[in-house]
Every structure is written in C-alpha cells, then in structure tokens.
C-alpha cells in the first residue's frame, strides 16, 4: 500500500514516540527471554522511523499473520493498538522462535494505528416486527452456600441421574467448587451437593464403567482465574448405585485449565475413552485422549495421549461426521487460532485433522459450539458463539452468533445470524412449537468493561432467534442489562410439552451484583399467545 507523503510523515513521528515509550519494558522482556542472544536487537533500534512502504507493510503483515490471521485494524480503537501489539511481541519473545523477521515494534504499532478508527462503532441488529408468540415466567433460584460465596456458575446440564427417574438440573460452580443437583419438581427447590471439587466447569453425564448407572464426567479448571498452572483435572464422579452418592475418581491431573471432557468409544470396543479440551492459557494447553486400557470386567484405567499441542480448546463434542461408523470429534480452538476443526477417526487410534472454518481475525473471541441440525435437512450443523472479552476486558464489535451450515462432504457454509456483545452460549430448541428450531443465547461480559463509553445496562443479555422459514431467523431481546450469564441449558423442565430454559449466573460478570445470591433462573415457557 503506497501512502501519501504527509501521512507517511505522521506515521514516522508516531512510530518514534510510541517506540520510545515502549523500549524499556520490551527490552526487559526480551533480555529476560534470552540475555545472551542479540537476535532481537532490531526491535530496539530507531529503525522504526523508516517509511511504511509496500515492502515494510508486507513485512509487518507477514510477521503478524504467520500463525494466525492478520489482525483487523478495526478490531480496536486507535489508542488500544500499542498494548495489543506489545502483547504479540511478548508472545513471540516467549515462544523461542527465531524463524521470523519481526519489524521494530513501534513501526508495527504505527501501522495499525494509522488504519484503526479513533472510536469503535457497534452494530444495531434488526429486531422482529412483532413480539415472540411465546411468553415466559422467570423464577430465580438460590442455593444456601451462595450466601457465603457468591455464585460463579460455569456449566448447566439437564439430565437423569437414574435411568428410571426424571431429569434434574445439574450445575457446576467454579468459585465454590460445588457440583450440585436440583429437582425442579420439588416445591422447596432445595439443591443437593453431589461433590466438592476445585473449579468445575463442564459436566457430561455418561456410564463410564458400563455398570448401568449414570456417572458424571467433569472438567475441573484448577483455578478460578485464567492463569498457566498444572492444577487442572478430569474427574469421574462415579455413581454408587446403592447409596445414590457420587465418588470422586481423578482420571487425569497435572493439567492446565480443563474446559471440556467428553466420552468416546474410539475403536468400538465397548469401553469408553475420554477426549479432553485442556484450554490452558498462554503456555499450557492441548487436546488429549485418555485411552481406556482396562481389560474386560476391569474398572476403567486411562493413559493420556496428546492429539494436538495448541492452547485454547473450548469444546470437543463427539459425532460421526463422515458417517463411516467411527466416532469423530470436533474442536473449537480459540486464543490466536479461532477455528473449528474436525478430528476424523481413522481407526487404530489415529485421527486426521481438518479445518472446517477459520475466523478472519485472532480477536474473534470464540467461546462455544453446539452440534445440531438447525435447518432440518438431516445434516448436523454447528451453532457457534464468539463473545469472549475476558482476555482484555474489551468489547468487540464482532461478537455474535453464527451458523456453520453442513453442505455435505465436510463442507460448511458460514451464516452470520446476529450480533451480540459477549455472546457466550447459544442453544437450539423449538420454543414456539411450530416444528422448527429456534435459538436462545446468553451473554457474559467482564466487570470494568472497555471502552468506558459502553452502556452495559443497555446491552442485550438474553436473546431469542425465532426461525420463521428454513434457515431464516428474526431476533427478540428477552432481557437487557445483565451480561453475567455464563451458562445455559434447555429442556421441558415441567413436562408440559413446552420447552423451557435456565441460565446460570457468574459474579465475575458485569452487573452481577444486582442479582444478589441468585445462582440461576428458570425461564418457564407459558405457551403460545393468541398471535397467529
């Protein structure tokens, strides 16, 4: 890109100033990374004052787009780019790589600042012309332990604990460490503590030992805050049939932050293995297979095997994607990768990795997927949210909900469904009983949200997308001002034929203090109104 002379001069002056401001901190970082190595010296020179010509721009884009998509300048307002570029250079310094040609940091900052807007603008999605034909009644839920410890619900699940009993609401509280169940048929709504873990996240019901009772597979983060450590675990809550109690059995420990764990009979032996999304943070994280090595009639015994070394995997749902009779799994990988990938089971313990879709920007904020046939064509699609703002507390204009439509032969077509700041979980269900799937979604944003000009109380926190024709949706906003819902589950909780949903509250979220000790709320579907 050829720049006019006046603009080039402006960029040169900005680059020099920004570089001088960052020399000290960056020098300490780079010297700490390798005190004896001078290969980073060009980053610390005044060469940043060179004009940004086409060759320099190519150098910047080559460096900033080597392991992920080149960041979009419009992802942040102008004054944010110094911090964002510095983080990228820090990441490169820590990586130990020497194969790239990093431009002087001040020049890179100046390049992105020159293209970034002074202030961000946020989209205003169109809403439905008429109200949703279904009304809801909300019921806040409280749990006695939240009086002492504010709730931080990370996962909700609607499942049976006994094959011959009705489903119950299961929840994981990543602050208190509790895994709890709540029978919504009980008038008192008293919760039962099933286990005390460290920082539980995803809960997956399964019969891991094949004894006919329903166990719980739990991903335990190992910390409340996002840091690198080795305290993450995969925990099997083994259901003791005679007593109804759950015994904690650790399947894997010494891991980074574990976000998800799913059972998979990888080679159709009749014994369940486990796929693990070890999200980690910056230096920890990967995708693991816990291979069940137990013999017939023995209790499960697992050996870990790394399938992918990247950090940032959020979800690993299991599905036979290529219809060959062998279970595959999908992985939503965030951090700088921002992609959905299929791990196709080749048999004999081998998987072939294939990218199904990749976001155009490393700040996309991927945070959840659901596998569901959204348009009713018989093929499993991917419902996908991107609204993670907890890495920098910054509200992105790109947050929202999308649908990756399965066209067959492992080809998926991208459809943007709606914009939604902090979109965290989206689940499909037929809420209006018309035979097709609608979508309910919740948002989760941090306290101290930036930029400060954002009016948090005006932001949508629960949205419903009504499917009005195959693959076509209109938007209804059910709630505003409480973007602290980190969990969501859908089910017919009262067995009246109408689909309800429940939300989980996390006090890390914005405006959570206004909800007090309410750890969850049920939105009871009261059925269709008279509108045709």
Give the residues covered by each predicted segment.
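Juxtamembrane cytosolic interface motif at the C-terminal end of transmembrane helices
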Residues: 25-32
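Beta-propeller-forming repeat regions
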Residues: 33, 37, 42-532
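Accessible peptide chain termini
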Residues: 1-2, 530
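Alpha-helical transmembrane segments
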Residues: 21-25, 337
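N-terminal Sec-pathway targeting helices
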Residues: 2-20
